[in-house]
Amino acid sequence: MAAQGFLLIATFLLVLMVLARPLGSGLARLINDIPLPGTTGVERVLFSTLGVSDREMNWKQYLSAILGLNILGLAVLFFMLLGQHYLPLNPQQLPGLSWDLALNTAVSFVTNTNWQSYSGETTLSYFSQMAGLTVQNFLSAASGIAVIFALIRAFTRQSMNTLGNAWVDLLRITLWVLTPVALLIALFFIQQGVLQNFLPYQAVTTIEGAQQLLPMGPVASQEAIKMLGTNGGGFFNANSSHPFENPTALTNFVQMLAIFLIPTALCFAFGEVAGDRRQGRMLLWAMSVIFVICVGVVMWAEVQGNPHLLALGADSSINMEGKESRFGVLVSSLFAVVTTAASCGAVIAMHDSFTALGGMVPMWLMQIGEVVFGGVGSGLYGMMLFVLLAVFIAGLMIGRTPEYLGKKIDVREMKLTALAILVTPTLVLMGAALAMMTDAGRSAMLNPGPHGFSEVLYAVSSAANNNGSAFAGLSANSPFWNCLLALCMFVGRFGVIIPVMAIAGSLVSKKSQPASSGTLPTHGPLFVGLLIGTVLLVGALTFIPALALGPVAEYLS
């Protein structure tokens, strides 16, 4: 079993790096504002038709464009969901959503969280899925990538006050990165058996003679960007454990690769744009070390089995509860870590049925800020915050002003870094406390004791860190939970983006200083260890007390 797990992890990472390297080169061209070959004419026509100016923006203008697009998208999606019964492509005649569920869903998909307090096949029409959710899957992913484009330019430009043009970046990211790659993945999914149709739900007779209604829909097109954009919201309630979304072992492997593809490629792109590929490899090493350790812990915990079932005399020591037998324990464990290390949230197994330790690791990966590969764009700019913090700590230890890539990290940048890092822990801890203090919060818990608290903590952690997965034993479709989680999702997304853009605006105006004998190298194993230690230290200090009340207490009981 150990050999199989090692081979699975090694194969996954090897194929990932092979695919991400060339994509990283393409992203580096876009960051450097170099059009991809053959796209100049198309871009010129599009920019002229849409009235888009390619004039560069300062950080406030860039941020305003990103926020404006997302707020407009939120409003459009909200009203679309409220009135979906008036819109076409609704063969099941599904009604509009309640105001609180529509708000929660709109915020969820605009913020790249894709938390779902509903069952897709019984709640949303084909039009809502396509024109509403799938469109936001593209736009939310493009927004995250655009923000990291701006931050990378801030590190590599000198004595400037502009960070690029947000509209140009968003168009290029959507047209030349997300759309073609998602199209290829969707075609592969269709070939493997993922649904792509507009048929009404089909009534069939099962082998037992019973009648069953099979849901249909344009699944493959949404499934592709759901994974590539680290969105994670399933077309069906069972998400990627549903055979109509994820029918084969090959589609499952491709889905895992798609989740990590752009976050990995952005690390390669960062190294190229910075003029030192070792900087990108340093980030990949730090992320990969944490990732491999977490996968190993989850695999070990799930292979050991559920001690309560073993005490009752169960034959198997492997915890298969809540898992698809066609995927098994090892693949389910790997997928769980992939989807929570990135801010994806898609699932092929029920995380609520994992063992106490097996469920704690995905929860902790979200709580540290989704920085282990992370979401498209958001993972890298989240990790860059920890890089700045690690550089600051190292500067304190050696008595020098901290600097990164030749740029001095001053008080303003550190205040903004601390603010950005503290946003999501504050939301998680205060949100969980509020839920446990109120009758409306506690009434949604289906399990008592430590596991019930773990379900609450997981839900708020998932929302605040824009992941979207859940411990499913929580009845979250209520006005209290829909509003609480919508607030966590919105502030967790834009409460981090705003200080990140402010940091970018501050750094882009500075000159790069040449390295001296006292400069801390930020590309070697020493800094990799320091960065990992910083991530672990912040995560441990912030969440150990809360985790002790949930999964740790459950494990010890």
UniProtKB/Swiss-Prot annotation:
Molecular function, one GO term: P-type potassium transmembrane transporter activity
One GO CC annotation: plasma membrane
InterPro entries in alphabetical order: KdpA
Record flagged with keyword Transmembrane: yes
Compartmental location: Cell inner membrane
Transmembrane segments: 5-25, 63-83, 132-152, 170-190, 253-273, 283-303, 329-349, 356-376, 379-399, 416-436, 484-504, 526-546
Primary localisation category: membrane
Listed Pfam families: KdpA (PF03814)
Residues of the signal peptide: none
Keywords, alphabetical: Cell inner membrane, Cell membrane, Ion transport, Membrane, Potassium, Potassium transport, Transmembrane, Transmembrane helix, Transport
Keyword hit for Nucleus: no
Membrane topology: Multi-pass membrane protein
Stated family: Belongs to the KdpA family.
Role noted for this protein: Part of the high-affinity ATP-driven potassium transport (or Kdp) system, which catalyzes the hydrolysis of ATP coupled with the electrogenic transport of potassium into the cytoplasm. This subunit binds the periplasmic potassium ions and delivers the ions to the membrane domain of KdpB through an intramembrane tunnel.
Subunit field text: The system is composed of three essential subunits: KdpA, KdpB and KdpC.
Protein name (Swiss-Prot/TrEMBL): Potassium-transporting ATPase potassium-binding subunit
Species this chain originates from: Escherichia coli O127:H6 (strain E2348/69 / EPEC)
Gene of this entry: kdpA
